[in-house]
Swiss-Prot record:
GO terms for biological process: translation. InterPro entries: Ribosomal_uL10, Ribosomal_uL10-like_sf, Ribosomal_uL10_bac, Ribosomal_uL10_bac_type, Ribosomal_uL10_CS_bac. PANTHER family: 39S RIBOSOMAL PROTEIN L10, MITOCHONDRIAL. Keywords: Ribonucleoprotein, Ribosomal protein, RNA-binding, rRNA-binding. It holds the Pfam family Ribosomal_L10. It comes from Thermotoga neapolitana (strain ATCC 49049 / DSM 4359 / NBRC 107923 / NS-E). Part of the ribosomal stalk of the 50S ribosomal subunit. The N-terminus interacts with L11 and the large rRNA to form the base of the stalk. The C-terminus forms an elongated spine to which L12 dimers bind in a sequential fashion forming a multimeric L10(L12)X complex. GO terms for molecular function: large ribosomal subunit rRNA binding; structural constituent of ribosome. This is Large ribosomal subunit protein uL10. The gene is rplJ. Belongs to the universal ribosomal protein uL10 family. It comes from the Bacteria. GO terms for cellular component: large ribosomal subunit.
Length: 179
């Protein structure tokens, strides 16, 4: 049993985390072994180096923390055993992909991913799959660079073709005059 001071410290810590987080995803963790949850945490640690965590916290403490952090509409996520995946540093979509794929690999009920908040916007359990299928920030940057680069490459190709044709015409004129 936690003392009042310990509970207050947890609420304060989680409030600060929720204020800084780009993602707070709530999940029912029942049915997983300790080894399973350790594996999930190691995947997050490997990708985020501490910028994302999967933490089990009592619902009453989460309620106080979310309220203090200014969130609204979280009550539906805090029914039954609940853990929270939060991201304070890095791409939040990648974290959703990691937990979504983890639940899929373990044949867990995907509705156990209850929903949460992404960049301050609330999302439901049904939207978790859609978020997991979004491209990561790196992929979006690569797509953007490709789209910007394509017209420039086309322009360079056209201009080089014009120069090539000019050289061919000049060579033809030179040969004609030398005859």
């Amino acid at each position: 049993m936690l003392t009042r001071q310990q509970k207050e410290a947890i609420v304060k810590e989680m409030t600060e985390i929720f204020k800084r987080s780009s993602l707070a995803l709530f999940a029912d963790f029942t049915g997983f072994t300790v080894a399973d949850l350790t594996e999930l945490r190691s995947r997050l640690r490997e990708k985020y180096n501490g910028g994302a965590r999967f933490k089990v916290v009592k619902n009453t403490l989460l309620t106080l923390s979310l309220k203090d952090a200014g969130y609204e509409g979280y009550e539906e996520f805090l029914k039954g055993p609940t853990a929270v995946l939060y991201v304070t540093d890095g791409d939040p979509v990648e974290a959703v992909k990691i937990i979504y794929n983890f639940y899929k690999e373990k044949n867990a009920d995907l509705s156990k991913l209850k929903g949460g908040f992404l960049e301050g916007r609330k999302f439901s359990s049904e939207e978790v799959e859609k978020i997991a299928k979004l491209p990561s920030k790196e992929e979006l940057y690569a797509m953007l660079v490709g789209r910007v680069k394509a017209p420039i490459s086309g322009l360079v190709f056209v201009l080089s073709g014009i120069l090539r044709n000019l050289v061919l015409v000049l060579n033809a004129v030179k040969e004609k005059k030398s005859e």
